[in-house]
Amino acid sequence: MTPDPGLLEACWRDFVLGVVQGLTEFLPISSTAHLKVVPVLAGWGDPGLSVTAVIQLGSIVAVIAYFRADLAGVLKGISGAFRRGQWREPEARLGIAMLIGTLPILIAGLCIKLYWPGYATSSLRSVPAIAVVSIVMALLLGFAELLGPRLKQLNQVDGRDGLVVGLAQVFSLIPGVSRSGSTLTASLFDGWKRADAARFSFLLGIPAITIAGLVELKDAFSGSSAGGVLPVFVGICSAAVVSWLAIDWLIKYLESHSTRIFVVYRLLFGVLLLVWWSGSASN
């Protein structure tokens, strides 16, 4: 039996979205911006928040698998803290920081869900808005790179770090900001070593991305989604594989390089988007 061409096209689109998601979720360049812009440039239209949020589950599978030893250490540290009161152990402090850092975006996301029903179609998701935000975030990341020294490591993390970086993570609800970009920028401003800042950003993102994906799971798998379950599953799988590769590359890259390449990319991305939008708007 010949497969339905509509289903094949839906699988191809979600595969591409998964690759884009995997490449951009953990790099400080905004997955939301690229998941909005790439389909528009391809003539597919905006896939919507529900589909893109669920495809993010592939990234979560990757980050949990990649940091499984760290997460096991956190669980062991928290367990030991409850049993023996060892709250100053690095693993316990990391767990507390992750919990504290998740609360701000959880509260903000809930407020948006309850009180801003038009968020998914608001002007914040427009191409010019995303372009401007990308340029602003590039400048902030570039400025953070100028500060020093880079001394703080992951084993020094505490509740204050969780709160500071967690508050920065809230800004990632603005399309184009980038969750990893906002948390990495905040960490660099606070004197973190780059690779350790990236590791904490990835770990902190696990609860936030998981919750966002699960909240939208029902809508993305509903009959209204093009092709039903299979295309979304394809997108999740491609996002998982590419996310793993992106995480591994970024951590190794930041061991010996600055974030300058991402500053330049985000500036060019924002400027080119504005040029493209201006040209299309005038036609």
Curated annotation (Swiss-Prot):
What does the record say about its membrane topology?
A: Multi-pass membrane protein
Top EC class of this enzyme:
hydrolase
TM ranges:
47-67, 94-114, 127-147, 197-217, 227-247, 261-281
* Catalytic reactions of this protein: di-trans,octa-cis-undecaprenyl diphosphate + H2O = di-trans,octa-cis-undecaprenyl phosphate + phosphate + H(+)
Listed A to Z, the keywords are: Antibiotic resistance, Cell inner membrane, Cell membrane, Cell shape, Cell wall biogenesis/degradation, Hydrolase, Membrane, Peptidoglycan synthesis, Transmembrane, Transmembrane helix
Cited InterPro entries: UppP
Q: What is its EC number?
A: 3.6.1.27
The domain of life for this entry's organism is Bacteria
Where does this protein reside within or beyond the cell?
Answer: Cell inner membrane
* Gene Ontology terms for molecular function: undecaprenyl-diphosphatase activity
**GO cellular component terms listed in the entry, alphabetical order:** plasma membrane
The main place the protein resides is: membrane
| One Gene Ontology biological process | cell wall organization
Q: What does the UniProt record say this protein does?
A: Catalyzes the dephosphorylation of undecaprenyl diphosphate (UPP). Confers resistance to bacitracin.
Identify its protein family. Answer: Belongs to the UppP family.
Q: HAMAP family, alphabetically?
A: Undec_diphosphatase
* More info: Bacitracin is thought to be involved in the inhibition of peptidoglycan synthesis by sequestering undecaprenyl diphosphate, thereby reducing the pool of lipid carrier available.
Protein name according to UniProt: Undecaprenyl-diphosphatase
What gene is this protein a product of?
uppP
